[in-house]
Amino acid sequence: MRLWPVFIVSVLFHAYAGLRLLPALSGDAWGLFGPTWPVRTLAAVLVVSALSIPLGLLGHRLGRQPFAELAMRALTWVGLLCMGFFSSLMMLTLLRDAALTAWWGAGVAGFQASALTAGEAARLSASAVPLLAAAVTLWGFVNARRTAAVVRVDVPLVGLPLALQGFTLAQISDIHVGPTIRRHYLRRIVQRVNSLDADVVAVTGDLIDGSVAELAHQVAPLADLQSRHGTFFVTGNHEYYSGAHAWIKELRRLGLTVLMNEHVVIEQAIRSGEGSSSGAPAPSGMSASLVLAGVTDFHAAHFDPAHRSDPADALAGAPPGLPRVLLAHQPRSADAALRAGFDLQLSGHTHGGQFWPWNLFVPLQQPFTAGLNRLESLWVYTSSGTGYWGPPKRFGAPSEITLIRLVAA
């Protein structure tokens, strides 16, 4: 990856923001000689941000060399924080430009009711933009770094056997262990998942951002995940960026079952004290089974043709008539899952947009952004993700650990 184009793009975008905001704050044509500390502070922040974003990307690369790891990780943190701040600053600057244009147009047309002069409106809005961007970034950082909350979702399935009433799947997705998400962050997630006492733990991809050599120690807490029937994993696109074959081997070593276009049949005995919907006690020893399948990432074939994602293949040889649950990283697998005959698909990938305004663009690529949705007879639950990617920032799309409970329709 060549970084000089990133430097050029970063400088150009920051220059635009500076030229739109600094003159309004300072009163001079270029906004560089304002006497007030807000002008100097914003100018300094823009310079640091313009340099830190590409240097942060460079730091992620050089951090692979042990001698530079701590310094480069610090540089990566600064760069990603600046990226989060500037993304909000840039969008708010563009919205400010649009609002001022509309305000000016209303005045020309004779509809302006505000007592503010053009200079006052420009100065007040230029002051508000960086303050609002900083507030959003700070709140987003707090949201991103705290342990994901548990979201409980009931999914009604037609003909669900009595022994599967209340069957639970704890879903975690898109943790992105890497430069800023480390072992202690993952350990907190594991502890919260274990407290749910789920029947199954499902990890729906994008677990890591880095190689096994870099991150094996950081993902070790996954070995402590506990559930009645085990932990199941499917690959996401980021596993393929980071060496999917090595990660599949490592996760299996940790005790996870990696489903590569394949399925398992899970038999569930009725829980003690449960009865039928009429209130009568259930017969002793009653049990039922469900099919839990998993597919490789939607785009896995771009990296390895042998990993082509195929929900139909994942069901090959499965017993007929059982409830069928699919783990698929991207919601885009839903069409194929519907054709294959699944009842429920658990996905991630979207992060729920992670922070505004990126949530507005998710529908351009994926059929669902977040939450429980229906595609004809198929239920699709899309997790907003348990970690984050890139900037440590979540705003309007909180991270989650999802506890899916199957109930009779």
What is the predicted role of each segment?
Residues 151-152, 156-409:
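Soluble catalytic domains of enzymes that build or remodel membrane lipids, polysaccharides, and related
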